[in-house]
Amino acid sequence: MHFYTMNSLLLIRPYSSSTSNTIKKSAKSIRNEFLNYFKKDLGHTFIRSSPVTPLNDQTIAFVNAGMNQFKGIFLDYYDPPTTKVVNSQKCIRISGKHNDLNIVGNDTYHHTFFEMLGNWSFGDYFKKEACCYAWDLLTKHYGIKEDCLYVTYFGGNEELGLKPDLECKDIWLSIGVSKDKVLPFGMQDNFWEMGISGPCGPCTEIHVDHTKQIANQSMRINKGYTDLTELWNIVFIQYERLTDSTIVPLSKQYVDTGMGFERLVSLLQEKKSNYDTDIFQPLFKAIQKFAKTPEYKGQFHNDESKLDSGYRILADHSRMITVALADGMIPEESNKLRKIIRKAIDIGENTFKKQGILLELSYAVADSLGDVYPELQTNLKKVQKIIEFEEDSFKRLQNTCGKDWKKMVEIRPDLVAVTDWMSFGLLNGYKYLQHTLKDLKDTKVLSGDVAFNLHDSYGLSAETIRELANIESLHFDEKAFQDKLQNLRYRSKIGLEKSSETLAKKIIELLEKNQIPKTDDTFKYEYVFNGNNCQFPTIASTIVGLIVNGNLILNRENEITNEKTVSNIQKKIVDSNTKSDQEDEIGIILDKTLCYSMEGGQTSDNGIICIKDLIFNIINVRKINDYVIHFGKFAQSDSKYSNEKLKVGDSCVVSINPEVRIGIMQHHTGAHLLNASLKQIMQAVYSRNSHISSHVLKLQFNSFKEKLTFEQLKKIENNINSVIQADVPVTTKIVNSLELLSEDFITLIPGEIYPYTGIRIVEIYSNNLKSKEACCGTHVPNTGLLKHFCLLNYFSKGSANLNIKAAVGSFAMSAKLEGENVQRKILNLEQKLKTEKLAYDIFKTISQEIKNDITNDDRKTPIPYLIKEECLTKLNDLNKNAWVQAKEIEKSTLSMDIKGITNSTNIFIVHCLYQNPMYLSLHEIVSFYTNIPTLIMLYHNGTVRARCYVPQEIASEMFNAQVWMKVLLDIFNTDYGPIKGFNPLLIASMATTSISDTLQESLIHKAIEQAKAFASIHTRKM
């Protein structure tokens, strides 16, 4: 099978950098010449490169060929937009038979990122034209000598009944290629297949002899020589492989070609290595300038310092990383991408002894590729923000997990083979694996269950699990692991509990086995908008299946009735361990419905199903493999007993709760506006998950350590409310996968796999905010229906995990009114504080009551987050003001008290307070008097303490704070108190000391008199 992989090449002679720096044609001109040849000369339509993120194929980690974005056409999901196409596709390959990551940088041509030049025909031209175009471009426009070119064609396969492609052979001969240079090869080299089944066909390859030898080199084709390589692969998609492996002709025929851009540039610039071209040389110069290391010399086999290989790896990886991040890939969602980022960081720090080199190189990559891929320039700040975050995370891991892992490797040296040893959960994951080894040794298999636990609980990737399995001599059951991983994603998408997974799987198997038709739920988007309100229809439907306590009923023989009689009939079909009839869970499967099932973070509708005179209350709705199951209970019948019975095949009428649906629509549209506003304000952000209900929206997102300020949150709220006031339309359109790729500035979920058809895009365009998302949820027709938007909460979990809770509509309006009510209370409190000189203890009581009300999480109606924060800040400010006001009042009172025992002739103050100040400290009281020596004692509840102050201009050896306080220490038989940070000659204190009630009066009187006497003696001398 041939999958557009360049043949493995055998290095037969050492390559070194070309000594000539002359560039005959620039890489840019070579690319443009290819595109213009097909666009201008041959009337092809240019379709830009898709992102390197595979949006429609979960079997690949990255887009790895030009044909990926056209698979929907080949699989006949939709018609092509035009019959002739040309493009240059960004591709990434980091694994596979010929793409070992460890080879990159150690040979002349392997890369993680490369460009694939290609042209396509969707039912226009076929073999003859495709071959002629390729030959003409290579020989006449690029000037490659015909003598250096060889072609291969499909030689047939008798087992599959496939004849040699003699038509292709004859075309090459008619073009003028000599017979000895037209060579047949088998399935492996010259037959292309998309997968195990699907479109396929023979291919023809053009090979080039880099040595330009006159002697015929036919015998060396496809033998792995580096000087005789495949240049262009032309695939003729004319067959289809069926699931039984037979191959039959297709009704439509396609041409699909691919040529490696870097290899073509190396050939035309006459370089022996791709790294010697002007694709990589600017990156080498950027590295050398930033790291201040010796220049790149192009050494391969004599590179003892590993500097040149470091140049090559870093240049290659920086291209791959910058392109992948600019295209919306997130390291958190792609272990392979994170692995390469960390490898590049490691080389930058260890080989070039420089931090931040990867971020610096992103500028050079954007300069190099930005003209043909403008998203690199547009998204450069986002790219650099993510690189900064990854560098910081990697550094923290090295300082923590890295040390512990190295200790583990010392105990078990085989663990050195684990490449991603910086994985956060690796250490604990390996300990878990060791614990389970005794159970695994018997089977010699690392089961899907154990592997899934390693991934789900410890975050280990499939690659790391595979490496650990090899170390422990276990076979890794990767298929079982991938199945469990897929089930997890599916459960998460549809909101299915883990405990329901097995049950759901059995039910779906039975439904499909009995060929029960899937539910048509396209009606969920239908409503009539009359300018003010949305009106939802009811639809007539038919019951195709019933689920009672997990048991599926598909035929008319079994029947159930309403709650009063259902248990009697269920005894026939339900075991004795089922719940009582009051708790019976019933699911109704219909052939069509207008109910939205829980999906994409949006909660399901609720409503009713009317069957005859029975009313079934829909509590929640789930969609599993396109079967929509309505879970709920029957309403109590008005009569004591109902003779009506429910059967498969019964007709019914379905309606939804309009208030719930409108609330959900409002909040989902609000979530889109919030997401758009976050992207507008933050450098890099992506939504991790969301929850949309009828009364609230919750968004969890990664901001790569960037936190939102209060002002930014205010701007977000104002921006969204301005869009609501503008009453702009919310439009939707349906596109296919190829059309999706052509959409500019669209928000997609990282790691999400989108279908080939029926992709719904929701757009909101206003003057100051634009939102465009691929979304299957329900939305309002215009933003005015949201009425108001307010944030309810904002908090972070960890360095990058931010959470926002918000509301729109009547819920937001109610929250706003609650907030305004609290604001009025605070304003009244402020007025009282100003006009009534409110006592601090009274103020504190009122203030605390308001604060408790604001922070009460059990409030029936929440207060908007911004109002809450403003109110709490205002209360804190008022508290400070009230405290200052109380202190001033107390200061005035104490000053009057002290003033009463002093007069203008006093040259010192000695006084005792008998009431503990509420707001002033003893130090603050002493500080009232900064120009004269002051000693204040405080007696309260059987204890006495004191503090004194002596001005610096008065302090001396005979009279200073310490010697003055010593008078009191001797009387109370105690020690000095703490005066941390003060000069002991100027400030002194006495430790709090207990004295008896009988002695307090005499001791305090004695202390006052002796302190006065001491001060009088020494101040008189001054």
Which stretches of residues belong to each language-model region?
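A glycine- and charged-residue-rich anion-binding loop/surface
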Residues: 12-1022
